[in-house]
């Protein structure tokens, strides 16, 4: 959940506070960048500049707030009433926020393992110990949050598994990582379809992660889909994100992927007849309906709309009753088009956040503060939901609840960052990871 640059001895904590001496509009950002609050900091090589990029933290906060939006639902929104606007926002962040979260996890892994140049030897071993320690603790935290009984799909247990699966990829450079992401995006969806149709027995799914099959194929955040996001994030993290040229290429790639996703899906479903094939073959919620020349256009439009509504309701992977499902591009379907669209939008959000963080630092400071402690904020919102559900579940759906969650996170994270720097959960992870590295190194040195 946290990230770093190359292996480096932590710099001395800066004791300057933004209210000390003459006011400078950039003081808050400069103080924060000079603090040793990079939870994944490692001790082998000093980075050449500030260890964090505030825009990346801001993008991570947007991912967290997107998951707030999905978890709380449209009824919790007050600002975007009437309901139509709320559904528009919900549809935009559903799927995309968790994909952005996973992509930024990959980016964090790249920063923990050498930034633009993968670390090797002892440095890579130390980084791997840190990553595995974090994965273990994040996974345990995810299990504990599952036990709260809050009816949301906890991503942390999946997230921990993604870290473990991604470790071999941390030795690769950006070009190879983009190739891995592309292969996963193209081959993963049909492989998932084939395995779920012929090998994997259907099993009831809960909001918790309860089996390896769920983690890999059938869960809310299946690795066969989400590792494409992690690999893409690693590829992004292996580039020089402070370079204007790199940012422009990422922006162009994001726009291109988004156009490909929407255009490719539309071409297959409409001009090439995929949507009508789904109507004729039937779906889980409606039987097949043969389409004949001269059919009532109103009825045909209703049938097509029914198929698209079912596509919008998918959570994790498409049904296996028709290969044409792989042509859809709706959230959480795990198709090639959905992966491309989610990566494209994630790249656009990331570049926009980096641009804004450099030009409106004071405005973006609270958002970046949330992004510096995402594990703390994510855990906190689940615990608050637990209290709400235990008291009166109806309160969960009250208007303006989402806005209060977002405002509370912004205020608390900003105050905590000013006073203490690193978030409490992030500090705990960092201490545990550093301790694990020390234990491993002591055992290696022992006769």
Regions found by a protein language model. Give the residues of each.
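Alpha-helical transmembrane segments and their immediate juxtamembrane cytosolic regions
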Residues: 13, 25-447
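Basic polycationic patches enriched in arginine
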Residues: 3-6, 13, 17, 35
